[in-house]
Amino acid sequence: MGSGHYFWAILYFASLCSASLANNAKINFREKEKKVLDQILGAGKYDARIRPSGINGTDGPAIVRINLFVRSIMTISDIKMEYSVQLTFREQWTDERLKFDDIQGRLKYLTLTEANRVWMPDLFFSNEKEGHFHNIIMPNVYIRIFPNGSVLYSIRISLTLACPMNLKLYPLDRQICSLRMASYGWTTNDLVFLWKEGDPVQVVKNLHLPRFTLEKFLTDYCNSKTNTGEYSCLKVDLLFKREFSYYLIQIYIPCCMLVIVSWVSFWLDQGAVPARVSLGVTTLLTMATQTSGINASLPPVSYTKAIDVWTGVCLTFVFGALLEFALVNYASRSGSNKANMHKESMKKKRRDLEQASLDAASDLLDTDSNATFAMKPLVRHPGDPLALEKRLQCEVHMQAPKRPNCCKTWLSKFPTRQCSRSKRIDVISRITFPLVFALFNLVYWSTYLFREEEDE
């Protein structure tokens, strides 16, 4: 029994010793890590103002490899021609002065949170408008130094970048927004930026944008030459396709409905002046408001956009429907005036005919001096000049038939040949306006959709 207690006591003592040794080992390892940092970054041992040497210690330019991780794309503004992006930016280079002993593979890398302790490339974003670092809860930045002298710098930043847009096909367009990175002070003789080999740009999965779709991205080089030398530059082009469904629901369908509503006046009675005027003015004002709202969300440009063609033609159709009623009203009043004049002319002719009949009857009666009445002979001699004059008065002159008018012949094919000219205008408009609008849609969509495919 005593030997058993003795065994467990020894085992407990051994476990305490091993734990103490492990803690001491950890403390000693961190002490060694601190000692390594002091050895490579101590006072007088490293100068962050001097750039590292080239590959294999040569005097060539320092090579910095870049890669990006796009975390989110917040907004793409058409009116400001800019977009906002949040990304993790990484750059990696080799500094021979930072090599250290990895303690038999136990020390994989050293981590720094102060970037100013080592040399840093002077990279800047050339098309940046605004930008800021993230410091919640701690600054989102670190530097890793590897045993072979390789340095990895990583930081999370948010940028607002300029994105010049061509809006000729808006809203059936595609836009290319670039992100450009260049050296500010070091020329290509001292510093060269390269994309990291193998997947230099990554994008977060399930990236959703309200009005665009990120189709693809392309990496390229954009070195620039100035009076002070040639500077290394990298760029990534993000290709965005605009989501058309939003504009179909918000713009195209409402405009079509307004145009169709304006045609209702063609089916109203031409005498319903208040109804037709109010309908035409209301649709015209609504269409004008819709157009101004669309233009308010776009920058003023010197060229015609696809949406301008659509809204302009729709506004023309609505205005044309209002002018059609003005023409119908004028034709109706003109027809009424002509009818009244025709009635007055017929009344005058009837009165003249009655007066002529009375005069002819009075000529047939002749009164002598003794107030006795006698009938004049009803048949006169053929050579009698008075008989010839009466015969000429009774002659009816027929006009020669006019040549048929093709337009009148075409108009006569519509219902009610005897209907007024104003009614015919309404009947023609009921057919002409929809046909012309359908033809416009055919030309519009075939033109812009074909141009969109060409841009692909």
From Swiss-Prot:
Expressed in the medulla layers (at protein level). Expressed in all major ON pathway medulla neurons (Mi1, Tm3, Mi4, and Mi9) and in OFF pathway neurons (Tm1, Tm2, Tm4, and Tm9). Belongs to the ligand-gated ion channel (TC 1.A.9) family. Glutamate-gated chloride channel (TC 1.A.9.4) subfamily. Pfam families: Neur_chan_LBD, Neur_chan_memb. PROSITE patterns: NEUROTR_ION_CHANNEL. Glutamate-gated chloride channel subunit. Together with Gamma-aminobutyric acid receptor Rdl, plays an important role in the visual response by regulating the activity of ON/OFF-selective neurons. Residues 269-273, 324-426 are cytoplasmic. The chain crosses the membrane at residues 246-268, 274-295, 303-323, 427-450. SUPFAM superfamilies: Neurotransmitter-gated ion-channel transmembrane pore, Nicotinic receptor ligand binding domain-like. CDD domains: LGIC_ECD_GluCl, LGIC_TM_GluCl. One of its GO terms (molecular function) is transmembrane signaling receptor activity. Changing residue 27 to V: In RNA edited version. It is found in: Postsynaptic cell membrane; Cell membrane. The lineage of its organism: Eukaryota, Metazoa, Ecdysozoa, Arthropoda, Hexapoda. Glutamate binding triggers a rapidly reversible current, while the anti-helmintic drug ivermectin triggers a permanently open channel configuration. Inhibited by picrotoxin. Pentamer. Homomultimer. InterPro entries: GABAA/Glycine_rcpt, GluCl_TM, Neur_chan_lig-bd, Neur_chan_lig-bd_sf, Neur_channel, Neuro-gated_channel_TM_sf, Neuro_actylchol_rec, Neurotrans-gated_channel_TM. Disruption phenotype: Viable but with locomotor deficits. Results in loss of light response in all neuronal layers part of the ON visual system. In Mi1 neurons, does not affect function of the ON visual response. RNAi-mediated knockdown in Mi1 or Tm3 neurons, does not affect function of the ON visual response. Residues 1-22 form the signal peptide. Keywords: Cell membrane, Chloride, Chloride channel, Disulfide bond, Ion channel, Ion transport, Ligand-gated ion channel, Membrane, Postsynaptic cell membrane, Receptor, Signal, Synapse, Transmembrane, Transmembrane helix, Transport. L-glutamate binds at residues 71, 90, 154, 183. GO terms for cellular component: chloride channel complex; membrane; postsynaptic membrane. The keyword ATP-binding does not apply. Changing residue 63 to V: In RNA edited version. One of its GO terms (biological process) is chloride transport. This is Glutamate-gated chloride channel. Disulfide bonds join 163-177, 222-233. It is a multi-pass membrane protein.
